[in-house]
Amino acid sequence: MKKNPSSPAGCPCGKPRAYPDCCGRWHAGALFLQAPDAESLMRSRYSAFVLDQLDYLLQTWHPDTRPSELEPNAADVKWLGLQIKASQQQDDTHATVEFVARLRQAGRATRLHELSRFVKEEQRWYYVDGDIR
């Protein structure tokens, strides 16, 4: 089930731009799937998690590591924010992004701290996998 961004003033990824001008442009429209770098893809994937845009998450996951399906957020999950700790480009086609995503589930606060790996193939960035920190 797709949701609408909760705040028209700011994107779910934490940038001060409105969703359509930030991650929304990678989720649909002329720039669909065209995030220009790994950090932009990471932010757009976080927003897709917040908004339950499962098709986008699967399409931006590298085919070699992509699951066959994803489950939508449980009803008691509330995403609270994203912090990019580091973003490094190893070469033209490989990058890492370290992030902390905060969420609350069943009233309990949780942090997901991950170092994610990305690869660029045929002019598109893909999430490959990550190490939980």
UniProtKB/Swiss-Prot annotation:
InterPro entries: NTF2-like_dom_sf, UPF0225, YchJ-like_M. Belongs to the UPF0225 family. This is UPF0225 protein BP2036. It comes from Bordetella pertussis (strain Tohama I / ATCC BAA-589 / NCTC 13251). The lineage of its organism: Bacteria, Pseudomonadati, Pseudomonadota, Betaproteobacteria, Burkholderiales.
